[in-house]
């Protein structure tokens, strides 16, 4: 089969559960790390900045039996290649598209967070006949008003967007991973889990994608390129009958009250479920609740 050509087998972390396997999928001469379990209709888990497929491990293993589970490391993250490219959303999307095509995935259920939502929804809007359903939370979904974000984050993001200053803070001094990332949890991450997220980025060069994350985040209409990129999915969200599930968390971070209200009005065939306390990397904070809600939703839509 097409998906078995030129793939490098690896061993996944044990937290993905018994029977999981890992391999690299080639894309434009680079490698996209993938963890897989099971068979049947694919369920694809896409993370965001600065994490990896590891973020999904607790949910992934709790959904064994629902289909062919596939958790990806986006280009520039985790165990995937970290090329010296411009990490625009369009460039990153090319690798996401290539991964879907390399595995020839159809009848796909997408489970998305952070920039994973931006890429997954963009792909869905251009491949509607290949999409079965979409679940998402804490998404990069549309422009965010700075008044809805913490003043500390707005100030830090503005500094990271300054040429030179962002490179020093994120790439040279590694302070995004050591200072900012740990701040996004109600309960501190266990040291071993923090190491799992930090280890894939040992050098300044390897952290280029991480810097692009805050620089690409759309706040007060900037950058306009991100706003335009996200708009590509709006018509599909507004018109598609594809089942959609949005999970909410308190206090949350990217899913502001304004964006939640926009979603309620704009997104067709949308269910919304409250999933408890969490900031942004909610797969670490509410894995059991997320898995339970996804399990019930997947069972429900399978009967439709």
Curated annotation (Swiss-Prot):
Limits of the AB hydrolase-1 domain: 42-154
Superkingdom per UniProt: Bacteria
Catalytic-site annotation from UniProt: 114, 138, 280
Catalysed reactions listed for this entry: 1-haloalkane + H2O = a halide anion + a primary alcohol + H(+)
Name recorded for this polypeptide: Haloalkane dehalogenase
PANTHER family, per the entry: EPOXIDE HYDROLASE
Protein's job: Catalyzes hydrolytic cleavage of carbon-halogen bonds in halogenated aliphatic compounds, leading to the formation of the corresponding primary alcohols, halide ions and protons.
Protein's UniProt keywords contain Glycosyltransferase: no
Known EC number: 3.8.1.5
Classification lineage: Bacteria, Pseudomonadati, Pseudomonadota, Alphaproteobacteria, Hyphomicrobiales
InterPro entries membership: AB_hydrolase_1, AB_hydrolase_fold, Haloalkane_dehalogenase_2
Molecular function as annotated in GO: haloalkane dehalogenase activity
Subunit structure: Monomer.
Keywords of the record: Hydrolase, Plasmid
Family note: Belongs to the haloalkane dehalogenase family. Type 2 subfamily.
Organism: Agrobacterium fabrum (strain C58 / ATCC 33970)
């Amino acid at each position: 089969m097409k998906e078995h050509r030129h793939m490098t087998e690896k061993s996944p972390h044990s937290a993905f559960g018994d029977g999981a396997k890992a391999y690299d999928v080639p894309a434009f001469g680079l490698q996209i790390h993938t963890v897989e379990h099971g068979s049947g209709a694919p369920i694809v888990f896409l993370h965001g900045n600065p994490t990896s497929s590891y973020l999904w491990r607790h949910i992934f293993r709790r959904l064994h039996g629902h289909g062919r589970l596939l958790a990806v490391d986006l280009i520039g993250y985790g165990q995937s290649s970290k090329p010296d490219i411009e990490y625009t959303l369009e460039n990153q999307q090319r690798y996401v598209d290539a991964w879907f095509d390399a595995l020839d995935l159809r009848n796909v259920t997408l489970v998305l967070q952070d920039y994973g939502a931006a890429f997954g929804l963009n792909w869905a809007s251009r491949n509607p006949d290949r999409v079965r359903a979409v679940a998402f939370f804490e998404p990069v979904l549309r422009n965010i008003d700075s008044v809805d974000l913490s003043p500390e984050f707005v100030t830090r993001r503005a500094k990271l967007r300054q040429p030179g200053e962002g490179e020093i803070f994120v790439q040279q001094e590694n302070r995004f991973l050591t200072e900012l990332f740990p701040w996004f949890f109600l309960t501190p991450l266990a040291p071993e889990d923090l190491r799992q997220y930090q280890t894939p980025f040992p050098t300044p060069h390897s952290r280029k994608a991480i810097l692009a994350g805050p620089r690409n985040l759309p706040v007060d209409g900037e950058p306009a390129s991100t706003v335009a990129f996200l708009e590509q999915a709006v018509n599909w969200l507004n018109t598609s009958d594809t089942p959609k599930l949005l999970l909410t968390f308190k206090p949350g971070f990217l899913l502001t009250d304004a964006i939640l209200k926009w979603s309620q009005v704009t997104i067709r065939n949308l269910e919304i479920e409250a999933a408890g306390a969490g900031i942004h990397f909610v797969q670490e904070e509410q894995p059991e609740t997320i898995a339970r809600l996804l399990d019930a939703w997947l069972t429900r839509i399978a009967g439709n």
